[in-house]
């Protein structure tokens, strides 16, 4: 288990990252391109909020399927419920203190085409 934390430490989650860190992604939707977050997809049951549930705020837009979660104190985006698979979260790898952010760029980072998502309203 690893800890996923916002910048101020008010929101903390335990996450199960399975065996190794790979299959990282970035999304190019209008929200994610502004955040620039590197994500790892995990099953919903592999994330448990252990501190600050009342500090977590949600942002939704367009189809209002995906949910982008952030800390109401520091604004850190911690994770999101994915619209392409609502049984999974995209976790912000930058919120895991044990992982050096520079190490993330050594992995292949897949780009997901959120700009042309089939569920988007046309």
Predicted regions and their residues:
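A short Gly-Trp-Pro
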Residues: 1-5, 10-122
